[in-house]
Amino acid sequence: PTDIGAGHRGASMGPEALRVAGLAEALRERGLEVVDTGNLVGPFNPWLPPTEGYRHLEQVVAWNQLVMDAMYAQLQLGRLPILLGGDHCLGVGSITAVARWCRENGKTLRVLWLDAHADFNTSDVTPSGNIHGMPVSCLCGLGPRPLTHLGGASPALRPSEIRQVGIRSVDQGEKRLIKEYGLDVYDMRYIDEIGMKHAMAEALEGIDANTHVHVSFDVDFLDPA
């Protein structure tokens, strides 16, 4: 667990908090087999200022490589991996792994990005340099090569493969990029108008039995950060 891509401490405590809260037991009570493979161990957070628009790029790449390898290994075993972060920069590694597995197995991919933020910043428009605000842009091929090519192929995702739900905070530079790349965004204004049920029905429209659905969930989707 890590907060390497964030600007504040705390996200690294997420996995242990969920364990203590009884996540595994709750899943087992629903008849699921749960295997806790333990924590990944990566570089410490040096808490340095941004360099060329990115904070801790080297460490972020290392963590996402670990995540990608771990996720892909579980998919290869036929399991459904659940990654407990950690800040949302780890979405680069997890979704890159899923996208690779889908390509190799002839599956279409639909990513549901449940978040208060669009996370589509780049080094040119980011107000902070924190890479937890950039995972979606990196997955779509915008960003430093070590992240955009983490799985070898770039982009890992096409904009048409992702639906962003619950968005309520978008930086000015992001708005232009989101419009340029044609992302499907279901922001809170739209959800307030039509309701979450209808918004999710739209976000899931077009999936079939050959579609692998991946959910990437940020806790501020429920409560503003």
Regions found by a protein language model. Name each.
Residues 1-225:
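Conserved alpha-helical scaffold segments that buttress catalytic/binding sites
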